């Protein structure tokens, strides 16, 4: 139920409100992600870089409450690395023996820490805008990965004659072209441990890959199972056909 509620919330926030996003945005171009297509898979290096972008840039405003720290084991990080990452965050636990809530370092089993305790605090810190949870954001609309990549790289100067409202920012791909979120990606805004140049396009591609995985972490397993089922059905079909030919071989038509 929480996943369904998150999808509904993400979809409502992804769509533009009447006052802020009248009109429609053009269809985003195909970013040619490696996980797209029937045989697509997630690149572990891109996932780890994408998590770094989320952690260092996006997590200041956006939660991912559908993920626990232990899920980071699935993107190729070691248990020691994940424990170190989790321990950087304080979470509320309790009550203790005295009936008091207390703060402690996060564990593998804890969900990602939220940047704000509630919606009101989030809006107060963001000029009234509510940063949506990103757990299933890529699934919130059709072609979500391509749209999100285009959105993150779509901050440009407004065309002549276009007036941008106070507190809004012009984006070529957002419906209505005016969005409350500022351009958060800057060249070399993060320093990748593997030496990959941290261009805006690379950061956008990596964090989109991470968010696509977060929205559907079972994607690779499901596709492998689909291939296995197709192979099984092909073999079964061949056996059934061969059996039919043998059983009916002596029957005259």
Q: What are these model-predicted stretches?
A:
Residues 16-18:
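N-terminal signal peptide c-region/cleavage motif recognized by signal peptidases
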Residues 1-11:
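Bacterial N-terminal signal peptides that target proteins for export
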Residues 90-178:
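Membrane-proximal low-complexity regions enriched in glycine and acidic/polar residues
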Residues 173-175, 180-216:
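Extended, hydrophilic extramembrane loops/domains of integral membrane proteins
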Residues 222-225, 231-253:
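Juxtamembrane interface at the cytosolic side of transmembrane helices
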Residues 27-52, 63-82, 195, 215, ...:
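Electrostatic cytochrome c docking/interface patches
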Residues 54-65, 207:
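The canonical Cys-X-X-Cys-His
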């Amino acid at each position: 139920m929480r996943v369904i509620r998150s999808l509904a919330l993400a979809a409502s926030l992804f769509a533009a409100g009447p006052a802020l996003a009248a009109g429609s945005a053009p269809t985003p171009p195909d970013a040619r992600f490696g996980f797209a297509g029937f045989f697509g898979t997630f690149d572990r290096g891109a996932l780890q870089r994408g998590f770094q972008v989320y952690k260092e840039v996006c997590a200041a405003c956006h939660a991912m409450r559908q993920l626990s720290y232990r899920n980071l084991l699935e993107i190729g990080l070691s248990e020691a690395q994940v424990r170190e990452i989790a321990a950087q965050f304080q979470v509320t636990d309790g009550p203790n023996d005295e009936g008091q809530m207390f703060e402690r370092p996060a564990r593998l089993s804890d969900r990602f820490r939220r940047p704000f305790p509630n919606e009101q605090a989030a809006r107060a810190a963001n000029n009234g805008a509510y940063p949506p949870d990103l757990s299933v954001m890529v699934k919130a609309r059709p072609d979500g990965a391509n749209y999100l990549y285009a959105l993150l790289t779509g901050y440009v100067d407004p065309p002549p004659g276009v007036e941008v409202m106070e507190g809004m920012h012009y984006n070529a791909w957002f419906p209505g072209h005016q969005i409350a979120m500022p351009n958060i990606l800057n060249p070399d805004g993060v320093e990748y441990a593997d030496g990959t140049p941290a261009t805006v396009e690379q950061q956008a591609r990596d964090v989109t890959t991470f968010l696509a995985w977060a929205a559907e972490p079972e994607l690779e397993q499901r596709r492998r199972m689909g291939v296995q089922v197709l192979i099984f059905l092909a073999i079964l079909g061949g056996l059934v056909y061969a059996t039919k030919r043998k059983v009916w071989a002596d029957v005259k038509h």
